[in-house]
């Protein structure tokens, strides 16, 4: 039997838009970036911790600040999906990270949402979008993000997430945003158990009550926190 994993249809539930910048997309935005620079600054061959890896995403974000740039990146991501035979994906991004060149957070969501819908029609790949707040965001920024999820609930925005450096920032600023999400029937996920241990997963489940945990690999540190139902933990 000629078995090739590349040909299998796949579901990808954890994609960060700012971590998917390919060299092909980058040189459409800035033709002067060399392949060696791309490998050094955007891939990171020596990332020893989450903070090091996030620096690569920060470099990519510099090229995701205009309508044209965002549309290039989204179209390129769909090309990557087609190469991997992805049939359904959930792509997350933080709108407030794309407003450095004059776009509003709402405009960012509109641009990415509209381009995603167009690419879905062209590719017949089904993609939902998840809006992220970040651990280092203020309470106001977190509430702004979840309100965008609510405002676009009739579009292709399917959920709310919290990402970034869990080791450096507590959950306090984000509790109200997740309470708002639950009151408005917004599906929630939360990154935890990646840079910290199982105790971080327990704290996240208790304080944010997400429907899913993103990563959660450190749950293995304590099997007590690997219940199939987060709401029962």
Stretches with model-predicted labels:
Residues 71-82, 223-224:
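Short amphipathic alpha-helices and their capping/turn segments at secondary-structure boundaries
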Residues 225-232:
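Conserved small/polar residues in nucleotide/adenosyl-binding loops
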Residues 16, 55-75, 100-103:
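Divalent metal-binding segments
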Residues 93-221:
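Divalent metal-binding pocket/active-site signature
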Residues 10, 53-62, 81-101, 126-132, ...:
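Divalent metal-dependent hydrolysis catalytic cores, especially in the metallo-beta-lactamase
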Residues 26, 77, 112, 116, ...:
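Aromatic/hydrophobic pocket-lining residues that form π-stacking "cages" and hydrophobic walls in ligand
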Residues 26-68:
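Active-site gating loops and adjacent loop-to-helix segments of metal-dependent hydrolytic enzymes
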């Amino acid at each position: 039997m000629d078995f090739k994993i590349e040909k299998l249809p796949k579901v990808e539930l954890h994609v960060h838009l700012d971590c998917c910048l390919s060299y092909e997309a980058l040189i459409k935005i800035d033709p002067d970036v060399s392949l060696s620079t791309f490998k050094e600054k955007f891939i990171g061959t020596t990332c020893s911790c989450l903070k090091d890896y996030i620096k690569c995403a920060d470099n990519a974000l510099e090229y995701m600040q205009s309508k044209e740039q965002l549309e290039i990146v989204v179209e390129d991501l769909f090309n990557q999906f087609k190469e991997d035979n992805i049939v359904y994906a959930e792509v997350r991004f933080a709108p407030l990270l794309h407003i450095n060149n004059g776009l509003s957070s709402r405009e960012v969501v509109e641009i990415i949402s509209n381009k995603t819908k167009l690419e879905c029609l062209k590719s017949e790949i089904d993609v939902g979008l998840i809006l992220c707040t970040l651990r280092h965001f203020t309470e106001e920024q977190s509430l702004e993000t979840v309100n965008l999820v609510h405002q676009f609930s009739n579009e292709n925005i399917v959920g709310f997430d919290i990402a970034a450096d869990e080791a450096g920032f507590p959950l306090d600023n984000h509790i109200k945003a997740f309470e708002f999400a639950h009151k408005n029937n917004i599906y929630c996920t939360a990154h935890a158990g990646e840079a910290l241990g199982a105790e971080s997963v327990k704290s996240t489940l208790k304080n944010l009550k997400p429907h899913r945990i993103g990563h959660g690999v450190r749950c293995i540190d304590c099997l007590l926190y690997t219940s199939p139902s987060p709401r029962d933990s």
